[in-house]
Amino acid sequence: MANKKIIGNLGEDIALEYLEKLGYTLIERNFKGKKTRGEIDLVMTKGVVIVFIEVKYRRQGSFGYAACSISDRKKKKLYETAEEYLIEKGLSFNQKCSFGAVLIDDTHYNREISFIEDIFI
């Protein structure tokens, strides 16, 4: 389990650096919803928009490509946890929000990073 956490943190570090270069600002990392028991990897802003980011990091030999691991169930959990985040932080449901994903496929020879700005389209 510790190895999975280390790998997850590495993926989040890579994603955070990538998004900051694109002009995003970190608000919170690893928000855990008590009610939903979900987790949001990165909560960021760009302008006035709060962006909830799911990070998927896959190394060579692991279970398929990163993009294949964002299921409808995961999207639903992300949305519900974002609602919980807004409530916990006292923010309005009128707050502009979006949901993105950073997909990282890492091999010994190459690292591919993709950013999906809206995973619900």
From Swiss-Prot:
Identify one Pfam family in the record: UPF0102
InterPro entries the UniProt entry points to: Restrct_endonuc-II-like, tRNA_endonuc-like_dom_sf, UPF0102_YraN-like
The GO molecular function terms of this record are: nucleic acid binding
UniProt cross-references to CDD domains, sorted A to Z = PoNe_Nuclease
Query: Any stretches that span the bilayer, and where are they?
Result: none
Q: What domain of life does the UniProt record list for this protein's source?
A: Bacteria
Q: Which family does it belong to?
A: Belongs to the UPF0102 family.
Q: Which HAMAP family match?
A: UPF0102
**PANTHER family of this UniProt entry?**
UPF0102 PROTEIN YRAN (PTHR34039:SF1)
For this entry, the protein name equals UPF0102 protein BHWA1_02005
| Organism annotation | Brachyspira hyodysenteriae (strain ATCC 49526 / WA1)
